Amino acid sequence: MENKILGLHHITAIADNAKRNLDFYTKVLGVRLVKKTVNFDDPGTYHFYFGNEQGEPGTILTFFPWEGIGKGTAGAGMATHIGYAVPQGSLDFWKNRLGEHQISLQESEIFGEKLISFNDPDGLQLQFIETKDDRKTWTTTDINSEHALKGFHNITLSLKEADPTLKVLTDILGYSLQQQHDNRYRLTTDSIDTANIVDIIADKNLPYGKNAAGTNHHVAFRVKDDNVLMEYREKVLSAGLDITPKIDRDYFFSLYFREPGGVLFEIATDNPGFTVDEPLSSLGSALKLPKQYESYRSQIEQTLPKID
């Protein structure tokens, strides 16, 4: 299994106000700020990584909070719904908690799984699904391990047509189609038990989305190490798709390619991980800069928006 895609690695989205984004995910949803750094291409913008206690792949939701970018529109060619696994029996807790924060939600069932759906402050669509999941959580004073988010359950891609993307997911990334109901498809990989589901909604009449606050930027799939990463680069190239060279993102190595439906896919390694520059006990507590920006730390710190 080590040379396979190991489900989701991380998901990256766009926000507007940095403090509002940080407060919502750490204080309302109770996930850990695993890393506080900056955008590699725009060091005046934060890059927040939220996850579980260990910052494990499959739990990491990251954000570029571009202040003043305005609201985006979810639509075709995007990952439109991010599904989190929550402990069995915890949905009532979350319904009450979200209600206390004046967050409206909808209850539904997809492929036999009960879930709640709601939006974050920028409009990003989140779903909480009750499921058996043994991953360790990050707990807070008011969210204990019986209720805390476990990490990703699934990601939903919205597309004009399903077949070209299904081919990439099955032929290149090793997923298999498990269920289909009308225009909704569910794919899984048996290489891992968690964060291993990709759903597709296909609708030829769905307008294309507009990338800005409240929308997904890219979806990253997980591999063990650099050797496996480069094997997948060859697979993507052999399928006739363009893909980047290997990129060092400090906490993982990455490749990027755009699948035929328009979604930006990344493949990212487990190594070296988030403890490469700070200990587990203090993850996310200090501003960490890519080495090319360290000599500009004072200017960057003055430029970044206030979040304390």
Predicted regions mapped to residue ranges:
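Short, flexible, solvent-exposed loop/turn segments with mixed acidic/basic and small polar residues
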Residues: 1-2, 71-73, 142-147, 207-210
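Vicinal oxygen chelate
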Residues: 2-4, 7-16, 34-37, 68-160, 181-200, ...
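Core segments of cupin and vicinal oxygen chelate
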Residues: 13-57, 100, 106-108, 112-117, ...
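Short amphipathic alpha-helices in soluble, non-transmembrane regions
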Residues: 27, 64, 97-98, 170-171, ...
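Conserved donor-binding loop and adjoining core beta-sheet/short helix segment
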Residues: 35-38, 50-83
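Short amphipathic beta-strand starts and helix->beta connectors
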Residues: 64-68, 138-141, 201-206
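Surface-exposed interaction/gating patches
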Residues: 146-233, 237-243
